[in-house]
Swiss-Prot record:
Keyword Zinc annotated: no
Gene: ND4L
Keywords: Electron transport, Membrane, Mitochondrion, NAD, Respiratory chain, Translocase, Transmembrane, Transmembrane helix, Transport, Ubiquinone
Designated name of the protein: NADH-ubiquinone oxidoreductase chain 4L
Catalytic activity: a ubiquinone + NADH + 5 H(+)(in) = a ubiquinol + NAD(+) + 4 H(+)(out)
Amino acid sequence: MRLTILLIIIGLIGYIINSGPLGRTNIIKLFISIEIMLLGVTLLIILSGYNNDDILGLIIGIIVLIITGIESAIGLTILVNYYKIKGSLPTNI
């Protein structure tokens, strides 16, 4: 339980630091921070399903991990292709 809260907080802090007036916006770091937060929430779903002996929580957690992997691959592919075409990544979001 502590690990999941720690992952969510680390992702949130990373998102806040890498966006807005606190730092230069880096879209890759924002993407990674969002993925860390989603991993924390998914781990929380899996652990709650395991603690309650509920198979549905485990199944939903696995489905979320699969969808997250697909979403990460598509997002990174779009960013790489954008970088190849434009020569730089957007810093204004």
